Amino acid sequence: MRGLLKLIQCEMRKLKRKHFVSFVVFAALLFPIPFTALVLAGSVGNFTGFEAVFGLLVTMGMPIMLPAALGIIGAMLFFMERDHDTLKNLRVLPVSPLKIVTAKIAVLYILGLVFALATMLSSMAGGLIAGSELSNMGENIGIAVITALLYTTSILPVVIAIVGFNRSYIFSIILTFFYTMFDYMLAYGGMFATTDPVMKLLTNIMPAPIIYRWQASMFAEAG
């Protein structure tokens, strides 16, 4: 276990050199600005203040930002050794490939939780700007954390495909964004095409529609 923690720390140190990770966290903090503007304009129905900003972030912000960012970061993690020609160094280390892969995947989950924390903090700031109280904090923290874990899990098949194809970063970005947007559109478009058997099948297989239905049930219970 201690060896795995050291590997995770090593992978995190590698990512520190990449400015993209800092950009993702910064984007998570800035993302609530347009949603807060919508809330202040009264453009989100019966929802107001913190609940409205948080609901918009976890149902419309995280499904796009988190999988897209983690897919690209996953490609960075798995291609670093290839790009820097250090794969031969890993082969002489007394560490199994399974542990190295586990450490890289663990880093993705950690970053997903960091994104959830940034989303929570920024939605709290947006709620305070909108002049509302911070209600249902325990439930909302749970929703943010579980949503982050689910979307992190949902992007793992894409990361595996990227590693398997072993192509350039451009290919990784295109594949990640195509998957993310297709999944996102299914979550909302699928609601209006439930009679189509193909669409019904896809909305029961793809992660975003399933996560969205779970979020809707959680918000309904909280409300």
Regions found by a protein language model. Give the residues of each.
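Terminal transmembrane helical anchor/hairpin motif
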Residues: 41-53, 173, 177-223
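Secretory targeting signals
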Residues: 27, 31-70, 102-169
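Aromatic- and glycine-rich beta-strand/loop motifs that create alpha-glucan
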Residues: 1-28
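Helix-capping/transition residues at the boundaries of transmembrane alpha-helices
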Residues: 14, 79, 90-92, 162-166
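Hydrophobic/aromatic positions within or immediately flanking transmembrane alpha-helices
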Residues: 25, 88, 101, 173-174
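Hydrophobic transmembrane alpha-helices of multi-pass small-molecule transporters
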Residues: 36, 94, 112, 181-185
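Helix-loop-helix units of permease transmembrane domains in multi-pass membrane transporters
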Residues: 76-109
